[in-house]
Structure formats: structure tokens, C-alpha cells
Amino acid sequence: MHKIVLLDKPRENPGELDWSPLQALGETTFYTHTEPEKAAARIGDAEIVLLNKTVLTAETLRQCKNLKLISVIATGYNTVDVDCCRELGITVCNVPSYGSEAISQNAIALLLELTNRVAHHDAEVRKGRSGGPGDWCFWDYSVMELEGKTAGIIGLGRIGKITARILRAFGMKILAHDMYQDPAWENESCRYTDLDTLYAPVSYTHLRAHETVL
């Protein structure tokens, strides 16, 4: 039987996830949260580690002599020193397509909040405010239409491309910056550019990249 350690559980609603398939694979220890300095002691002689946001440094990894696999329960794996893992022969895996549609949807929801101020006007109506006698509406902010405006997307990967498709459906033009350019996306409604050029004409910017890109 394998020895498995889950260093930090991703946020979940009570009873939402069934961990029994994981527990069936071996002796499993769960932690809700693990500070970086406690990681090595908690991993101990475990062969398999699962984590969400716990930081695993080279110093920590070198203390874990029996470690064979690190499974990141997320898309980003920048909290793990992958260069050190490669040196030590530790396999690192992640969930590359996790939540791509949901994250794009959330980005669009935030954008529409900026343009339409739905939350503000909802709160005002709940306070009892109305447009007044003879008027069926009111607004404290002008509605900003997205049609014809330009959006800047930094990081045109899985999430960035889904977001771009939605923005194009609104009639927006797309400027994108990415270290790895996809020729199939270079067209009249989307073009790649450098960061300085991207910032100049855009109305809205969507960031889908690690902090190191900037």
C-alpha cells in the first residue's frame, strides 16, 4: 500500500467531494492547510503528495527521500520547484483544463459588472429606490456598450481563448500577448502584439498569466 499525504484541501462545500477512491489506494493523511516550513515533516516517507497551494521548495523536496509523485489539484504548478523535481526524479502532474469555462465566465461577469453596474442598481432597488412617479427606470451610471471596443488579453491559452470567443460574440476586437503564439488565432478580430502596444488602445484588459510574465 502506498503512503499518501494531502497537504492542503481545495475549497469545497461540505460533502461535495468523495475522497474514498484516493483512500483506497493506500494509507492517506489529510491536512486542511500546510505552511511551507511544515511540509517536509508532514510528507515524511510518503511516496505520493497531493496539494493545491502549498509551496514545495528545493530544500523541502530534498528532505523527502521516498517521494515519487506530486499531484497538484489545480492548473498552476508554480508553487512546486519543478526543476528540483526533475533532478530528483519526482513526477509532477496537474489538471491543465480544470475550470477553464467557469473562470472565463467569471471574467465576463466581472466585465459586465463594470459596464452595467448591476450590483449597484440591484442594491438601490432593494433599498426602495425607484425612478419616481411616471418614470419606469433609473440609472446612476451610463451603460457602456462592448460592441466595437477593444479588449486586451495577456495569456491567450485555454482560458484566454475561451474568454476571447465570448468577447468576440459581443462584437469586441482582441489584442493578445502571449509567449507562444497560435497562428490560427491571428485574424481580423484578434491579433498578437507586445505589451506596450496592447495597453495603449484597449478598453479592458484580461490577465491570464503568471506574475513572471510581467
PLM regions: where:
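Short beta->alpha connector loops at strand-helix junctions that form conserved
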Residues: 32, 73-74, 91-101
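Single conserved hydrophobic/aromatic residue that forms the stacking wall/gate
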Residues: 206-214
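Hydrophobic/small residue at the entry helix of a nucleotide-binding pocket
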Residues: 159
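Glycine-rich Rossmann-fold phosphate-binding loop(s) that bind the pyrophosphate
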Residues: 156
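Phosphate-binding beta-alpha-beta segment of Rossmann-like dinucleotide-binding domains, i.e.
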Residues: 88, 96-150, 165
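N-terminal glycine-/charge-rich "phosphate-binding" loop or analogous flexible N-terminal tail
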Residues: 1-46, 171, 175
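NAD(P)-binding Rossmann-fold cofactor-contacting core
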Residues: 170-186
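Short acidic low-complexity segments
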Residues: 34-42, 187-202
